[in-house]
Amino acid sequence: MERIKELRNLMSQSRTREILTKTTVDHMAIIKKYTSGRQEKNPSLRMKWMMAMKYPITADKRITEMIPERNEQGQTLWSKVNDAGSDRVMISPLAVTWWNRNGPVASTIHYPKIYKTYFEKVERLKHGTFGPVHFRNQVKIRRRVDINPGHADLSAKEAQDVIMEVVFPNEVGARILTSESQLTITKEKKEELQNCKISPLMVAYMLERELVRKTRFLPVAGGTSSVYIEVLHLTQGTCWEQMYTPGGEVKNDDVDQSLIIAARNIVRRAAVSADPLASLLEMCHSTQIGGTRMVDILRQNPTEEQAVDICKAAMGLRISSSFSFGGFTFKRTSGSSVKREEEVLTGNLQTLKLTVHEGYEEFTMVGKRATAILRKATRRLIQLIVSGRDEQSIVEAIVVAMVFSQEDCMIKAVRGDLNFVNRANQRLNPMHQLLRHFQKDAKVLFLNWGIEPIDNVMGMIGILPGMTPSTEMSMRGVRVSKMGVDEYSNAERVVVSIDRFLRVRDQRGNVLLSPEEVSETQGTEKLTITYSSSMMWEINGPESVLINTYQWIIRNWETVKIQWSQNPTMLYNKMEFEPFQSLVPKAIRGQYSGFVRTLFQQMRDVLGTFDTTQIIKLLPFAAAPPKQSRMQFSSLTVNVRGSGMRILVRGNSPVFNYNKTTKRLTVLGKDAGTLTEDPDEGTAGVESAVLRGFLILGKEDRRYGPALSINELSNLAKGEKANVLIGQGDVVLVMKRKRDSSILTDSQTATKRIRMAIN
């Protein structure tokens, strides 16, 4: 206090002020501080001081030939005095203005190409719409977000190779461009940048922006796609938000969004097939998103979402070490636990076998619309601090945390039996049983939980079983906070294993993800997703299954035909017929299958009854496990367009219509393809199929014994000849080929030769 008084006293004297403002600084320590080292100590002051001088800039002497001595206003642009200590000219800031207005103009053609990301940003902002500003508390949580719209998804190393190849093509150094995207981008950029005068370093920087995903860990309250993040400073403050609709979309956001939809569809579909893991891999490998293979996107794209991570785990890629439960991402921030099995009784006296985690642990829980901090001990919730966008989101988080705590009062709150099943009709595990039960109705759970008086803590408030806020009481251990809980920032990836049923575990055996955790939300993808796998035919409904099944048979008719005659069981078990079964009424599937298989067997036995159209039409029905019955059918029912429609065993119907003249098949009025051979040639089809591997020598030759049936042919040795009965009772002489290589041509020549031999 004394010192301050003394200073005030000094400052009141005019002499003090004069000394401090006018006298030179000549204290050695101060001079040293500001003059030692190359580093500028006060850059802004230095800049202001320099710019106040007449000629603060130096330039090469050649500039005097390019800039006049005075501008239009008669102001001097450069000094005739040389810069001390160098042979450069001293120049006025006015010279820069003159140069910008009157200097030489280079071609600007490359600017939009190089500064593509900036030009696109301007367009997005021009067409974007900003809505009203709302003042309200912003619950922001830090999330890892993409801050660079419009980029490809190359790794830093891949991008580096592309940049070197584009900008410095002649530099030495090992660059191997392997991925398809690398090659495409390199070719495209080399063409764009011919005769480009922009400095290579600048080009390299801009290319990096275009090729690599840049992420930051930022506090966000609203949308997290990159076109929202680029205007984060305009759309949300501490206590306000401004509505904004982006004026354009960017490929990287579309890829992320479409990848999530494709992954969810694939995981949901795989979960109900006989071998989920194999099916999932088959689908990932045969799917394209926006024309790029899904597996390539999975390798490069860092999106963390349950279904995406299951697909990555199946491909052997590393994923985040956090685990998922009830749609929330849990990350253990401290503590540890050991697992043991324990049997518990629900309020309905049903026995559940739980894997109990013993020990004290703390978790952060991050969901789409709510976040929380959870502290728990063995089967006991100690504290839960929740924040969320609305009451519904807060309820969801509380239910998940209460179930996760495994507390006895939660298990005793179960009313009725727990028998929830997944899509494949298998019972869910006990934790998911409990979760589904209380997600449907949490009333009893909240009432049974118990309440406690609370202390007044800043920013926290109590919540009662009926979800009303309170400052006096709250459900035991539960508080609602105004502040969000940050997402776990560590981007570490761990090695995981995945079992047949798509359960993903870390190296300690903890389950991180399972199909139960995959969201049921349906969305429309921004990019075209092309599922080539037959398992995904049903994604567009029953009609698509019907059309795709018949298209597949027609496309593969050559091989289908051979299998039909030689190895029907293998054909019936093909996975391409699996989706079709869901269209056939369950009660009659087996009878249909038995009937069609018997019909087919007769066709094989009684020559001349082979009918291509009929085989194609009825084949999918034969795939179900057959029931032997004496029933005959004149039509078979399929459930499409919301009702049963009939396929006639003999003849056309709206469902299956074959036009003999055009050889086109229409299914439900939609084109399903053309048959390359004429089904009217009666038996030609099966003959040529079975006679692959045999050479037709001519008419019957009695010396080679009685005519064999087509099925007996398989016993011939190579080079052996035999008469064979074909078609409408005609007999021809054949020889089994000595070489297998020419088998392919047989079926074409067979048809012609049979005709010649018979005529």
Swiss-Prot record:
Annotated site location: Mammalian adaptation: 627
Pfam families: Flu_PB2_1st, Flu_PB2_2nd, Flu_PB2_3rd, Flu_PB2_4th, Flu_PB2_5th, Flu_PB2_6th, Flu_PB2_7th
UniProt-listed GO biological process terms: 7-methylguanosine mRNA capping; cap snatching; DNA-templated transcription; symbiont-mediated suppression of host cytoplasmic pattern recognition receptor signaling pathway via inhibition of MAVS activity; symbiont-mediated suppression of host gene expression; symbiont-mediated suppression of host mRNA transcription via inhibition of RNA polymerase II activity; viral RNA genome replication
Any one of the GO CC terms: host cell nucleus
One term of GO molecular function: RNA-directed RNA polymerase activity
Keywords, comma-separated and alphabetical: Cap snatching, Eukaryotic host gene expression shutoff by virus, Eukaryotic host transcription shutoff by virus, Host gene expression shutoff by virus, Host mitochondrion, Host nucleus, Host-virus interaction, Inhibition of host innate immune response by virus, Inhibition of host MAVS by virus, Inhibition of host RLR pathway by virus, Inhibition of host RNA polymerase II by virus, mRNA capping, mRNA processing, Viral immunoevasion, Viral transcription, Virion
Cited InterPro entries: Flu_PB2_2nd, Flu_PB2_6th, Flu_PB2_C, Flu_PB2_CAP-bd, Flu_PB2_middle, Flu_PB2_N, INV_PB2, PB2_helical
Location of the motif Nuclear localization signal: 736-739
SUPFAM superfamilies linked: PB2 C-terminal domain-like (SSF160453)
Localization per record: Virion; Host nucleus; Host mitochondrion
Subunit structure: Influenza RNA polymerase is composed of three subunits: PB1, PB2 and PA. Interacts (via N-terminus) with PB1 (via C-terminus). Interacts with nucleoprotein NP (via N-terminus). Interacts (via N-terminus) with host MAVS (via N-terminus); this interaction inhibits host innate immune response.
HAMAP family: INV_PB2
Entry similarity comment: Belongs to the influenza viruses PB2 family.
Function: Plays an essential role in transcription initiation and cap-stealing mechanism, in which cellular capped pre-mRNAs are used to generate primers for viral transcription. Recognizes and binds the 7-methylguanosine-containing cap of the target pre-RNA which is subsequently cleaved after 10-13 nucleotides by the viral protein PA. Plays a role in the initiation of the viral genome replication and modulates the activity of the ribonucleoprotein (RNP) complex.
UniProt-recorded name of the protein: Polymerase basic protein 2
